[in-house]
């Protein structure tokens, strides 16, 4: 239903405009009702994440439902990289560059378009050194971590933070591999 309605807006619009963006935002924000957010919370509870991580994520969703969007965004944006590491079976220190590269590979392994990885690299974990670099509605981890806010974050930005986390949580994990002393890898036995 939502996809059909968005296509309707796209097909009846004369091109990219603020009006079209607002119409699409209204559809998406209307679709993600408090009930749908609670459904997301239930699916996260059923995930393979550690109980304390599930609790943190659940509290971020509750903050969103209460209209405390800054809390939701601040929490979730700092969790994304850890969630990605969980999917990649990374337990130690790992560079952001390698994480981004391996995340893009994981997205491909899940038969999804690489644009999701590019979105993550270019808008989510990229540097945000000034308030002017903030893109409204898109929660940038670096910007959030360093208080680069033009104004109080809105519901759209909070929902985007939730949907990014949900996207990561629902990816199939990377096939575990074993690295041999010669640097070669092969699939590990379960």
Question: Could you tell me what each predicted segment is?
Answer:
Residues 44-49, 103-139:
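Short, mixed-charge amphipathic alpha-helical segments
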Residues 25, 57, 73-76, 80, ...:
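Short runs of predominantly hydrophobic/aromatic residues within well-ordered alpha helices
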Residues 21, 37, 100, 116-117:
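Alpha-helix initiation and N-capping motif
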Residues 1-43:
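Internal, Lys/Arg-enriched amphipathic helical interaction segments that engage polyanionic partners
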Residues 43-107:
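Amphipathic alpha-helical interface elements
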Residues 37-43, 53-60, 140-147:
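Glycine-rich, often proline-containing surface loops adjacent to acidic residues and nearby aromatics
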